[in-house]
């Protein structure tokens, strides 16, 4: 077992040394802004999907939740709120106030 561990460590060390030998030297030869790219180059690399079909309308407004008023009524009743935590809001509302 020790021999296997030693062999694995030696192989890892050899790979690290070989990787450093093939790497570019850092310093004067490396370009000044190698870590940063312009916005144009970045947008060519990362193509974002178009989110909205009609750009001139702007961002779509999220749809209003039709159950929100009922959810607030259920939250004001401690028993309904506790039951909603266990079985879900719609079922708790139905049991206390009738069909949703």
Curated annotation (Swiss-Prot):
A GO BP entry: regulation of cellular response to insulin stimulus
Signal peptide region: 1-23
Cellular compartments per GO CC: cytoplasm; extracellular region
UniProt-annotated location(s): Secreted
Keywords: Biomineralization, Calcium, Cleavage on pair of basic residues, Disulfide bond, Gamma-carboxyglutamic acid, Hormone, Metal-binding, Secreted, Signal
Entries under SUPFAM superfamilies matching the protein: GLA-domain
Positions of Ca(2+) 1 binding: 68
InterPro entries noted in UniProt: GLA-like_dom_SF, GLA_domain, Osteocalcin, Osteocalcin/MGP
Single annotated GO MF: structural constituent of bone
Modified residues (4-carboxyglutamate): 68, 72, 75
Binding residues for Ca(2+) 2: 72, 75
SS bonds (residue pairs): 74-80
Record: residues binding Ca(2+) 3: 75, 81
Pro-piece positions: 24-51
Entry-linked SMART domains: GLA
Entry PTM: Gamma-carboxyglutamate residues are formed by vitamin K dependent carboxylation by GGCX. These residues are essential for the binding of calcium. Decarboxylation promotes the hormone activity.
Primary localization: secreted
Family: Belongs to the osteocalcin/matrix Gla protein family.
Function: The carboxylated form is one of the main organic components of the bone matrix, which constitutes 1-2% of the total bone protein: it acts as a negative regulator of bone formation and is required to limit bone formation without impairing bone resorption or mineralization. The carboxylated form binds strongly to apatite and calcium. The uncarboxylated form acts as a hormone secreted by osteoblasts, which regulates different cellular processes, such as energy metabolism, male fertility and brain development. Regulates of energy metabolism by acting as a hormone favoring pancreatic beta-cell proliferation, insulin secretion and sensitivity and energy expenditure.
Protein's recorded name: Osteocalcin
Organism: Pan troglodytes (Chimpanzee)
């Amino acid at each position: 077992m020790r021999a296997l561990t030693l062999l694995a460590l030696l192989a890892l060390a050899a790979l690290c040394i070989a990787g450093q030998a093939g790497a570019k030297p850092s310093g004067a030869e490396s370009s000044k802004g190698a870590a940063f790219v312009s916005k144009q180059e970045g947008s060519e690399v990362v193509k974002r999907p178009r989110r909205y079909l009609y750009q001139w309308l702007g961002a779509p407004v999220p749809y209003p939740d039709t159950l929100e008023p009922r959810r607030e009524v259920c939250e004001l009743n401690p028993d309904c709120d506790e039951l909603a935590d266990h079985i879900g809001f719609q079922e708790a509302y139905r049991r206390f106030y009738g069909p949703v």
